[in-house]
Each structure stands twice: as C-alpha cells, then as structure tokens.
C-alpha cells in the first residue's frame, strides 16, 4: 500500500486548471455566495481534495429516496445518490481531522439550496458543501457524462505558487471491475467496505447503502 502511495506522490505535475471555476457556497453569514476554486485553498495547505457528489443521482438508480424531510419531496431522479451519501456520512466525521492538513470540499451539480438542505437533514456539520450548477467543472473532470449524468469522482488539485494543477483523480471508476464487484475507485477511503473486507463473509452481495434502515 505504501509503495502505491509513494508512486502516486511521484507522479509528474498534472495539467493546469483551465479556469478559476466559480462555485456557489454558503457564506459566513449563511447567505449564498460565489466561491472560486482558488479560494478553497487555505494558507499553508497546498492540496485540495474535491468529492463530486452525485446529486442528482444516476438515472438508473432506483434505490428508495430519503424517507423524510424536504429532500424526500424531490422526484427520485433529482434526488441524491445513496452510495455517495454513505461515503459522505463517513467523511463528515473525519473532516475535522483531515482539514488540519488538507483542504476538502464536496461538489454537487444540484442547486446550492438543495445541497445545503440535504446536508442539514443528514446532520453533516463539517463538510464544505458547494454547487457546481453554474460551471463546467463536473464535465471537465470526468464527474459528468456527455449526456449529463453525474459520476462520483474524487479529484485532487495542488497549488504551486500561483498555479493550480490537477494531481490525481479516481479514474479507476471507469476501469473494468472484477466479476460481481462494484468499482473500487475510492474504496480505500471507506471504513464501511474495508470493515466488511476483514470478515470471513467479505462484502455483502446484493446489498447497497440506504438512506434509512
């Protein structure tokens, strides 16, 4: 595992971002505000990880939506992805620790009001939630298909002086999977699936994360 991490750290610099993307976020006063990609880098922290949250979900995902709250009133196809939600439930708990050394943000194509409302309904308190509804970020970084369907990508950027460059993305999502397995592009991040991997039973078959049990 360390050998893979070392090889990743030794990757050559990626391409510079083509624009200083403008996202929508929540200001200190609680009002919507524009946030540039460059503003997601805090002093002394030159790496930024952005998780592209599938909100709206994949059109073929028929998993039941949230059982209550304002988000439950959305058409299923416009609602959030339950698998992404499970990952973000876990990242919210780790975000305070992560943010000591790394900038972290969660991006969704849904309007900001929907993203923030759902975050409150899930009890997320530490994740920085943003909307990319007004720009091409998702399409530019493999988090959106040409048809507009959202994809769950984790993308890392690095700041070098005044330049911001792409460093790494979870492109393993697009690689062929082992028989009967889901993509493991961000699998090392999730306690949920890694705990299953430690058991004699392994990962449960024919089971997916739900909004409520």
Give short role names for the model-derived ranges.
Residues 1-48, 53-96, 100-101, 117-121, ...:
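Non-globular targeting/processing and membrane-anchoring segments
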Residues 99, 103-131:
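Conserved segment of the thioredoxin-like fold in thiol-based oxidoreductases
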């Amino acid at each position: 595992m360390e050998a893979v991490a070392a090889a990743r750290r030794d990757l050559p610099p990626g391409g510079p971002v083509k624009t200083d993307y403008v996202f929508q976020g929540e200001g200190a006063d609680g009002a919507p505000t524009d946030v540039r990609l460059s503003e997601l880098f805090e002093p002394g922290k030159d790496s930024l990880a952005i998780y592209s949250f599938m909100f709206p979900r994949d059109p073929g995902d028929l998993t039941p939506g949230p059982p209550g709250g304002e988000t439950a009133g959305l058409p299923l196809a416009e609602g959030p992805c339950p698998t992404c939600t499970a990952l973000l439930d876990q990242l919210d708990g780790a975000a305070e620790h992560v943010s000591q050394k790394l900038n972290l943000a969660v991006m969704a194509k849904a309007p900001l009001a929907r993203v923030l409302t759902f975050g409150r309904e899930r009890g997320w308190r530490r994740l920085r939630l943003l909307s990319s509804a007004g720009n091409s970020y998702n399409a530019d970084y493999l988090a959106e298909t040409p048809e507009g369907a959202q994809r769950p990508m984790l993308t890392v950027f690095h700041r070098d002086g005044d330049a911001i460059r792409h460093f790494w993305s979870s492109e393993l999502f697009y690689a062929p999977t082992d028989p009967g397995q889901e993509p493991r592009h961000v699998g090392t991040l999730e306690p949920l699936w890694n705990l299953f991997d430690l058991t004699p039973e392994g990962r449960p078959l024919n089971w997916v994360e739900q909004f409520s049990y």
